[in-house]
Amino acid sequence: MIILITGASHTGKTLLAQRMLEEYKYPYLSIDHLKMGLIRSGQTTLTPEDDDALTEYLWPIVREMIKTAIENQQNLIVEGCYIPSDWRKDFDQQYLQSIHFICLAMTDEYIDTHFDEIRRHASAIETRLHDTDFTPESLKADNHYYIDSFTRIGEQVTLIETASEDSICELLKIERIKWMEQRFNNALAAIKDESAASLKAIKEDVAELSKYYGSELWKLDFAADEAGNLPPDLKRGVLSEDGIWNLLSDYREIQKKKQ
């Protein structure tokens, strides 16, 4: 499974990737690190300020790394700014079903309220904006770009509206449910198909679903759902006890028949 994280500067992409690494034990690739390695080694004449050109240069490399990881059934978190809004066109469905996408952006209200805090935590190496240009207006423009370009093409953008650390913790919970829901749907489709290739493709999905269902995390997410504390538009069939129990039971029965 690939977790692809993008968004505006200072939205917590690296922090989210780190939290996911800690929770899922997946390694992660920083596109910024790849960028600086190529620039410092003289492999390109581009500079860190050449945002659009860097996206055109870096994305073909990153997308093929993603395909290779999927083909090798490896897990990877990929994080960075240089992901085009139409990234899906570069992957067939067999790849897309193994990619979980997250885009982060801050609201104007959040920027107005927390600008000084954002500026204090800004990294001189990672920022896409010069210090002299780092104003509330420039930061809003950067976030508007991600909100507009990604929503225009049909992608969901997660808006940061509360204190960053709290937002990241809440986001991690929501993305965990979305991610498991994606695995749940992959497994449902494969079990319905019953072909050997389909069942082989969901082996990891079923293993992760089984681990999730038997963990305290599932109980916490289930309790949050029962209490009405999850977004109403969040699809969460994976939090149906009958649904996930039946799925895992059906998978085991099919595997027994094929032995």
Map each language-model feature to its residues.
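Walker A/P-loop
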Residues: T14
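P-loop (Walker A) phosphate-binding loop of NTP-binding proteins
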Residues: A8
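NTP-dependent small-molecule kinase module
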Residues: H144-E175
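ATP-binding Walker
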Residues: T11
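A glycine- and Lys/Arg-enriched "phosphate-lid" helix/loop adjacent to the NTP-binding pocket
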Residues: I99-N143
